[in-house]
Amino acid sequence: MKFGVLFSVFAAIVSALPLQEGPLNKRAYPSFEAYSNYKVDRTDLETFLDKQKEVSLYYLLQNIAYPEGQFNNGVPGTVIASPSTSNPDYYYQWTRDSAITFLTVLSELEDNNFNTTLAKAVEYYINTSYNLQRTSNPSGSFDDENHKGLGEPKFNTDGSAYTGAWGRPQNDGPALRAYAISRYLNDVNSLNEGKLVLTDSGDINFSSTEDIYKNIIKPDLEYVIGYWDSTGFDLWEENQGRHFFTSLVQQKALAYAVDIAKSFDDGDFANTLSSTASTLESYLSGSDGGFVNTDVNHIVENPDLLQQNSRQGLDSATYIGPLLTHDIGESSSTPFDVDNEYVLQSYYLLLEDNKDRYSVNSAYSAGAAIGRYPEDVYNGDGSSEGNPWFLATAYAAQVPYKLAYDAKSASNDITINKINYDFFNKYIVDLSTINSAYQSSDSVTIKSGSDEFNTVADNLVTFGDSFLQVILDHINDDGSLNEQLNRYTGYSTGAYSLTWSSGALLEAIRLRNKVKALA
């Protein structure tokens, strides 16, 4: 990635935009401009991906307010979900979406030797997070018990509270934000000698990494500790109850922060983090949570809805959560990585459902355009019939890429059992060629380094590519990604230039590049 070229483009765009004056008028300032003189080359996947990484990073950064960026109609550090201001209006900053966006920014920062422009964007995000935490809102305030107001899902781009009706609270946001910022502190220590980049700037609410830990990360973690066993709305903002995705990212945030708390001599809190993370791990895996359902042999995203017979429990969140909480090359105590048999079976069953559900998938034999969940009726601007989502499809590509990367990088054997058998046998390899007696066995182990292992690893990458081919076939000509693609025609629909869509594709390309770089 040639960051100098990319950021010079941003600077030119910024100079052409009007400065913000007076009260917020989100419709007065355009924040979308297509990547200069670019048109998607649909000739082949390799050609597309080689250029698209730079293009998707452009569109992601375009939706972040910071001095070197294009979007200036917001407090520095603000992430808009989309420039779309009507039909639908996504011109807000969501706690969850912002944190996930910055996890992608951190991936770029880590892969590019702590690029200081990206580091500044991250620190502006941390700064605006401090202010948002202390903005009273319909969910509560910072001074409430366990900082109740941190469960507020979204804010206006000027940092003021959004006071309209919404699904409140959403308990995944504080956890994801705590994890993202904690990960940045580790990057600062490992890649930049513990030095922040904005401490000499005005209007910054921290002067050290300890300030960030005590005043920004810790309050989010206290919220998680206080409310992890309370119901809230899911990541799709539609249903209140217990959610696999929410509990998983909460467990990740707590477990990840234990060592950080210890590094700042906060031993008692580290113990609380550790014990609560352990409780959450048991809750995720056990009968209390109800997420692992052996009757159906897959993860149930919302057990309450299954009990009410309103949903079967299949949901792309059951593989998005594992991907977000298990970065490549990271040692993690968080359960349910993508190699978990129940996660894989959930992934497989959703794929099988979506192949039949969405007419656009009739053109594909392997990967497919994937939606949020089978019962979805949100069409991008109202209710009728749900569509596939670009981000769900990009994350679907990441699953086999990560399976291949983890197995090859650690020289791990690949174990196939009765639960994940259908996925491997249908899409990756004919298991009868490996073990003719497999179906009478409990499992088969494919030894690392064997010819069969190399075949499976290569086929996993090919299978991941089949999802990116779907994206190539339906991405906008300018390389931007909407929220959805029409279930019949494949044309883009819903909010345009969705930040999360670009981020999910970026992460898929990153994973693909890393697994292909392995010998």
From Swiss-Prot:
Known glycosylation sites: 115, 127, 205
PROSITE patterns: GLUCOAMYLASE
Entries under InterPro entries matching the protein: 6-hairpin_glycosidase_sf, 6hp_glycosidase-like_sf, GH15-like, Glucoamylase, Glucoamylase_active_site
Signal sequence segment: 1-27
Entry EC number(s): 3.2.1.3
One Pfam family here: Glyco_hydro_15
Domain of life: Eukaryota
Active site positions: 234, 237
Bilayer-spanning residue ranges: none
UniProt-annotated binding residues for substrate: 166
Keyword Signal: yes
BP terms from Gene Ontology: polysaccharide catabolic process
Gene3D superfamilies noted in UniProt: 1.50.10.10
Descriptive protein name: Glucoamylase GLU1
Lineage of the species this protein comes from: Eukaryota, Fungi, Dikarya, Ascomycota, Saccharomycotina
Gene expressing this chain: GLU1
